[in-house]
């Protein structure tokens, strides 16, 4: 039913992680089997994303981001056949990891996009929405799903030094395996004045959204995003953190699928550089490389890790002219 709240579906999710976390005696293979069962039971899975390279900024302030998150939550309530596993709202693009039939998942995006267009028009914003189109890719294995979840949850962290993967407030990553969920008490949207409810969800009819919860006028992410389901695809918090911080190869595969640009931070590119030059040239610092070795290392970072010209310049101290000649398609 379209009017069913997102929360009701989430409450019905069997939180496999919570079921197993008290049993430390489970072996690696047993934990992995439980994750596989969750994967098989709850699919199919999709990564919906938009192209930030073509789109102007949509969210330019905290108010804009909060509005976008409320509208996504409202869309989830109106499209309850889809389960939102995680998401990331960026300034000019979005990532949604979802489960459900493809057509239902695309309907969720269409509802969300429609609400964005109408709401920002009322706010007086002039935005060319034509590039804001959904691309959708299937996720066909448990490991691939883990990588796609992590990729989405890292997006703001890679783009801005102001955030860690678990501190960005407009994405599901801040709720994955975080203890703050047990220490806060969100308020039910339906307990607020009707005028306030309408203002938050940008809708006169607030009945479909009664399951949403609020913290300081910001929508409570677990009330519309099925964090418990997302957590169930990882063996435990440590395995989640390991993939989050130590899997550059996996990030590169996802970035290639999405035709994305930078997907590693400067620190991560630097670590990859040190590993490479130590293995290939038996040196410990980029400054010890010869000019020819720097060129080879630049090619390695560009083609293996999609490092930007700016990142390579900062790490290898190569001139912009040399880098533009090596990789002319990057600015």
Labelled PLM ranges:
Residues 93-95:
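Histidine-centered divalent metal-coordination motifs
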Residues 1-86, 91, 101-331:
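Short Pro-Cys-Gly-centered "Cys-loop" motif that presents a nucleophilic cysteine in a tight turn
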Residues 97-99:
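Short hydrophobic/aromatic beta-strand micro-patches
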């Amino acid at each position: 039913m379209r009017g069913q709240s997102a929360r009701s579906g989430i409450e019905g999710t069997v939180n496999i992680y919570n079921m197993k976390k008290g049993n430390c005696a489970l072996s690696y293979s047993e934990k992995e089997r439980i994750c596989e069962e969750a994967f098989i039971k709850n699919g199919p899975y999709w990564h919906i994303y938009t192209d930030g390279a073509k789109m102007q900024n949509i969210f330019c302030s905290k108010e804009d981001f909060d509005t976008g998150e409320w509208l996504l939550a409202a869309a989830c309530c109106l499209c309850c056949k889809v389960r939102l596993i995680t998401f990331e709202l960026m300034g000019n693009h979005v990532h949604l990891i979802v489960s459900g039939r493809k057509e239902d998942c695309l309907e969720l995006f269409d509802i969300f996009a429609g609400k964005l267009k109408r709401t920002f028009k009322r706010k007086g914003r002039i935005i060319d929405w034509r590039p804001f189109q959904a691309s959708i890719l299937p996720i066909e294995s448990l490991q691939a799903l883990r990588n796609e979840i992590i990729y989405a949850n890292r997006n703001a962290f890679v783009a801005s030094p102001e955030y860690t993967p678990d501190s960005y407030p407009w994405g599901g990553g801040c709720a994955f395996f975080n203890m703050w969920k047990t220490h806060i008490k969100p308020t039910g949207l339906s307990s607020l004045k009707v005028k306030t409810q309408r203002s938050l969800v940008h809708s006169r009819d607030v009945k479909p959204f009664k399951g949403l919860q609020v913290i300081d006028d910001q929508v409570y992410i677990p009330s519309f995003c099925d964090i418990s389901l997302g957590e169930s695809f990882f063996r435990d918090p440590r395995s989640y953190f390991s993939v989050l911080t130590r899997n550059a190869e996996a990030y590169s595969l996802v970035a290639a699928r999405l035709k994305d640009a930078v997907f590693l931070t400067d620190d991560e590119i630097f670590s990859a550089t040190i590993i490479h030059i130590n293995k290939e040239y038996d040196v410990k610092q980029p400054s010890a490389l010869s000019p020819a070795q720097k060129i080879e290392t630049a090619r390695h970072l560009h083609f293996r890790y999609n490092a930007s010209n700016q990142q390579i310049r900062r790490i290898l101290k190569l001139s912009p002219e040399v880098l533009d000649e090596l990789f002319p398609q990057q600015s």
